[in-house]
From Swiss-Prot:
Keywords attached to this entry: Coiled coil, Methylation
PH domain: residues covered: 28-136
The keyword Coiled coil is assigned to this record: yes
Residue spans crossing the bilayer: none
Family (UniProt): Belongs to the PLEKHD1 family.
Region (Disordered), start-end ranges: 264-284
Protein name per the record: Pleckstrin homology domain-containing family D member 1
Coiled coil feature spans: 146-391
Annotated Pfam families: PH
Length: 505
């Protein structure tokens, strides 16, 4: 029954680019070819061949001879044998007796079904697809499509305007974020410097602890020396009182001897006793000389004891001054140690807080970047729905909150590098001051070595060594005191120092 050739169905010129250029736009068709057709409206098993053309949403059919004219002139006849509107039609494949590749076209307004048949499965599939696509073109769909196009155009213009505004704002905020990244890098570099300064602080604290222990030992030694001097002062005072008492007794004895000599001189002696008088007088004179010699010796001892007491008083006063000096230096070192410990703890807390803030900022920055990417994808997407619009609004709100928070914190974050730079400069100035103090300490070491120890006649070699140790401790304490005073002076006079944290405050 199938006598037609396999090329009875041909694609439309719109599907073939070479043929599309040769046709007028009004004559372009979607598909044409020869199909079998059963009569409409009456029950008949007879099939006849017809030339069919799909033009827009209409199916036109002619006699089979019209195909040759159409392929030659590329124009279709405007007087077809019949026209079937395809808008809203249901097209499906169907098997008929002797026609395995049949197609049924039905519509609620048709009084019957339109039955067509192709000669191969490929042709059937091709015609089914094109008929179904053409059936989608209706007046209602055209009106809806036009309204949708206008709505999408207006929405596209509004979204394009909003996109441009968002892009401008995002460019400004991106520049702000770049500036914040640079500030964060500067803060990280300064944190590294401060970490090195923290290590130096720990070394200074350790040195101060060692010096404090040494001062405690030297202070105990000074206290023992002072106690020995006080004991020596008591012994010298007792010796002086004893010598004074002895001198008074000798003075009384001398006075009595002189009185006896005066009485012997004034009293007349018998002639018989003249031979015995010289020995008695000589004895009194001898006793008087002995008393005078003894008094001179005691006076010399008394003067020596008074001299020793004076030296001991001077030594006691010097030791007392040294003890007070060591006590004040020990207290100063203790205060400095507490301040440095507090400053170290404060610096650690600030570093931890800075790391926490930086991690939070990086987290919020990642969230903002994710929201920005989502917003870009939503703006570039051609498909619009309510869910995507809600997501875009949420992304915009998130970005707005993030940038507003960045603007609020901009001033405070801008001041942080200046404060941290000032702290680094102060530490550098303190380091230079430490070197200067050490230089002056080396210069003053010669003056300490030239000093003579003030020792009394009872000072032993061990006490002399202790005095030398006390002088060395005094030198170290003097050096440390200047160091601490110089640091406090630099920190008090440096610009911006009031913004630095101080331990214990």
């Amino acid at each position: 029954m199938f006598t037609s050739k396999s090329n009875s169905v041909s694609p439309s010129p719109s599907l073939e680019q070479a043929d599309a250029d040769a046709l007028d736009i009004s004559t372009k068709v979607q598909l044409y070819g020869v199909l079998w057709k059963r009569p409409f409206g009456r029950s008949s098993a007879k099939w006849s061949r017809r030339f069919f053309i799909i033009k827009e949403s209409f199916l036109l059919y002619y006699s089979e001879s019209e195909r040759k004219s159409f392929e030659t002139n590329k124009y279709f006849n405007i007087h077809p044998k019949g026209v079937i509107p395809l808008g809203g039609c249901l097209v499906e494949a169907r098997e008929e007796p002797s026609m395995p590749y049949a197609m049924k076209i039905s519509h609620q307004d048709f009084h019957g079904n339109v039955l067509l048949a192709a000669e191969s499965e490929f042709e059937q599939t091709q015609w089914l697809e094109m008929l179904q696509e053409s059936g989608k073109v209706t007046w209602k769909n055209a009106q809806l499509g036009e309204a949708m196009i206008k709505s999408l155009e207006a929405q596209g213009l509004q979204l394009a305007k909003e996109k441009q505004e968002y892009l401008d704002k995002l460019m400004e905020e991106t520049e702000e974020l770049c500036l914040q990244r640079e500030q964060r890098e500067e803060l990280e570099r300064l944190n590294q410097v401060l970490e090195a300064e923290k290590q130096q602080f720990e070394e200074v604290v350790q040195e101060l602890k060692v010096e404090q222990e040494q001062i405690k030992r030297e202070l105990e030694l000074t206290a023992r020396c002072l106690k020995g001097v006080e004991q020596e002062k008591k012994e010298l005072r007792h010796l002086t009182e004893s010598l004074q008492h002895t001198l008074e007794e000798l003075s009384i004895e001398k006075k009595k001897t002189l009185e006896m000599l005066e009485e012997d001189k004034n009293q007349p002696q018998p002639l018989t006793n003249q031979s015995e008088q010289p020995p008695a007088t000589d004895g009194l004179h001898s006793n008087l000389r002995q008393i005078e010699e003894r008094m001179q010796e005691l006076l010399a001892e008394k003067l020596l004891a008074e001299k020793r007491m004076k030296e001991n008083e001077e030594r006691s006063r010097a030791l007392e001054e040294e003890r007070e000096f060591y006590s004040s230096q020990s207290q100063a070192l203790q205060n400095s140690l507490q301040e440095l410990t507090a400053e170290k703890q404060q610096a650690e807390q600030e570093l931890k807080a800075e790391v926490k803030v930086r991690m939070d900022l990086e987290r919020r920055l990642r969230e903002a970047e994710a929201a920005l990417r989502s917003l870009e994808q939503g703006l570039n997407s051609k498909v619009r729905n309510k869910e995507k619009e809600e997501r875009m609004r949420a992304d915009v709100s998130h970005l707005k909150r993030f940038f507003e928070e960045c603007i609020r914190n901009a001033e405070l974050e801008a001041k942080m590098p200046v404060i941290m730079k000032n702290s680094v400069y102060i530490h550098k100035a303190a380091t230079r001051r430490i070197k200067s103090c050490r230089f002056h300490r080396r210069r003053s070491s010669t003056s300490w070595n030239d000093m003579k120890p003030s020792q009394s006649f009872m000072t032993s070699q061990l006490e002399a060594n202790n005095i030398e140790e006390l002088k060395e401790v005094a030198k170290r304490l003097s050096r440390d005191q200047r160091f601490r005073e110089s640091i406090y002076h630099i920190m008090a006079t440096q610009p911006g120092a009031s913004a630095l944290p101080r331990g214990g405050k």
